[in-house]
Amino acid sequence: MNEKKAVILLSGGLDSATVAALAKTEGYACYSMSFDYGQRHRAELRAAERVARQLGMVEHKVIGLDLGGIGGSALTDPAIAVPESPCEGIPVTYVPARNTVFLALALGWAEVLGARDIFIGVNAVDYSGYPDCRPAFIEAFERMANLATKAGVEGQGFRIRAPLQNLGKDEIIRAGLRHGVDYGLTVSCYQADEEGRACGRCDSCRLRAAGFATAGVTDPTRYG
C-alpha cells in the first residue's frame, strides 16, 4: 500500500503548527517546508524546527530565498517600520508574492515526493487582510497547479488544503490543542527577538493574544 504523503508549509507560527498537527491526524506522512526569505523575525525558523520535531515530520526542509531583494514589506525591509496599531487596508507587513512563491516551491517538492496534498495555514477570519490568504487565491493556485505540472496533466491532481480558512483564531487554538500542538514552541511576532520573545504590539501579536483570550486558554507566549 502506498504511503499517503503531504507537504506542509510550516512557518513556525500558530496557524502552520496547527495545520501540521491536523495533517498528521489525518494519517499523512508529513514533509514540512520553511523559508529563510530575509524576514526580520528569523526566530520563526527555529520555531519551525522545534514544531517539526515535536509533531514528527518525516523531513523538514528550509529553503533560502532573497525576498528582501524585492523589498516592499516591513518584514523584509528594515527601513519600513512594523505597525504597532491597527490600520485600514492591506498593511505594510504584506510581503509581495510570498504565498505564491512558497506554494510554488511546495508544489515542486510535492511532485518529486509523489505527494498530492499541500497544506497551508492561511486564514480569512482573524487575519491581517493579505490577498494571498483568501479562498479565491487558494482555489486559483490549485487550478494552476494542475495545469502546470506533469502529475497534474497526467491526471494525478494536487489539492491545496487550507483547513483553517474559515476558523476564528480561538477555534484554531482549540483545534491545535486537541491534536497535541505545543504552542509554547511557536513564534508569531513580526519583530520577535533572537530568543523568540514577542513584542506584544504588532498585528500578529494582537491576533494571537486575542485568540488565546477568547479560547479561555493560557497564552504561553514569551514577551520581551
Swiss-Prot record:
Pathway: Purine metabolism; 7-cyano-7-deazaguanine biosynthesis
GO molecular function: ATP binding; ligase activity, forming carbon-nitrogen bonds; zinc ion binding
Keywords for this protein: ATP-binding, Ligase, Metal-binding, Nucleotide-binding, Queuosine biosynthesis, Zinc
Species in which this protein is naturally found: Azotobacter vinelandii (strain DJ / ATCC BAA-1303)
Domain of life: Bacteria
InterPro entries per UniProt: QueC, Rossmann-like_a/b/a_fold
Protein name: 7-cyano-7-deazaguanine synthase
Family: Belongs to the QueC family.
Positions that bind ATP: 10-20
Cofactor names: Zn(2+)
EC class (word): ligase
Transmembrane regions: none
